Amino acid sequence: MNYEEALNYIHAVQWAGHKPGLTRTRTLLSALGDPHKQLRFIHVAGTNGKGSTAAMLASCLQAAGYRVGLYTSPFINRFNERIQVNGQQIPDEALVRLVERVKPAADAMTDIPTEFEIITALGMLWFAETKCDIVVLEVGLGGTLDSTNVIDPPECAVITALGMDHVKELGPTLADIASAKAGIIKPGSPVVSYGGVPEADAVIARTAAERHAPLTVVDLSRLTIEDGDLDAVTFDFDGLNGIRLPLIGSYQPRNAATAITALRVLRSRGWNIPDSAIRAGLEQVRWPGRFELLRHSPVFLLDGSHNAHGMRATVQSLRDRFPGQKFVFLLSIMADKGVDEMLALLLPLAGQFVTVAAHTPRAMPAETLAEQIRARGGRAEPASTIEAGVARAVALGGTGPVCALGTLYFSGDVREAFAKLNQ
C-alpha cells in the first residue's frame, strides 16, 4: 500500500456518513490493543473555537516540555494535519503502516465503522506509538456519541463557545446542543467551560454536578484586549500581561483565556506548566485558515467561519481591524448551514461577492448562492472553480481588502490558488 492508496482506503465510500455511537470505535480499538488506554487527554468540545483552543493548548504544553499529540478536523492542506505530535504531522510512511494495521480490523467488523472512527483509531495508534505525554483531542461532532468519547476520564474536559450548529444531529435548542457537548464530562474529571449562554451553562453545570466533576467557568471579566494589528492581538488575562497572540481574530483572546484556564487546572493536578510556557506557547501558536492573513497589502484574508455563530465573531473582527471598509467576499457555504443569517451579517460589509462551491456534496452551488445574495440586494457573481473565484475576487478587490470565508472545506484550495496567482 502506498500513501495514495492509504488515503483512498480512509476516504472509501463504504465508511461514509455520520453514525453516532461508541460501540464501533470500542470494537475497533479493542482489536488494535486499546492504544487509547496508554494515553492521557485534554478533551475539547464546542461549537466554535475548539480547534483554535486545542492548538493553543498543544502549543503551551509543548513549550512546557511535554510530548503532545493533537487530533483535529478537518484538514486544510493535507490529511496528515489531523494527527500531529509536537507540531509535526504524522509522516506519510507511518500513516500507510498504520492504515495497513487498521484495515484487517475494520474490514472484519459487521457494523461498519465510519471514516471518522477509522481516523480516530489511527490517531490513537500514532499517539501511543510516539509515547505522547498528553493528547489534545478535539471532538468531531457533539460529544456524548462522538467516537473520541471512548476515552477514560481526561485530565480536563474543555467546552468552548456554544451556538446553533448541527441541529439535525444534536437537537434544535441550545440546551440540546449543550447536553451533547456536556457528554464529554466524565466522573471526577475537571471541566472548563467558556460559558456566557445561560441556557447552555445550566445544562453544563447540572451535568458536572451530577458527575462530581469540578467545574471552572472562564472568567472573561479578567480579560483585557490591549490592541490588535494585522500581525498580532495583545491581551492581558488573569495576571498574564502583554501576550502577543499571532491569531488576529478579535475573538481569539477569548479562546486563549479558555486555554489558559484549562492549563491552570492541569497545573493544579500536578502538571508542570509555568506561566512562561503559557506565554511562549501562545506567542508561537499557528492555526491556519482562521482569520489568517495571506497577504498584507492589498489585504487577502482566509477564514473558516461556517455557521452564524462563528460568522458573527468574524464580522466583528473585520469591523475591528478594517473600520469602515468594504470587502470583496469570496464565499462558499454549506447548504445545511444558516445561510440567511450569515448573508445578513456579511451584506453590510460587502462591496461585492464572488461565489464558489467547495469540493463537497454539501456545498451550495455557486449560482444558487449568488442568486440568494442578489435577492437580498447584494452584488454577486458565481465562479465555475475555486481557482477562477480567487482570481476574480482579487481582480475585483484591486487595492481593497478581499476575504475568503464560509467554510473550512475550501481553505486549502483557496490557499493553493492564491499562491499560484502570486507566483
Language model regions located:
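Short, surface-exposed connector motifs at secondary-structure boundaries
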Residues: 183-191, 321-327, 349-354, 398
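ATP-dependent carboxylate-amine ligase catalytic core
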Residues: 18, 22, 26-37, 63-152, ...
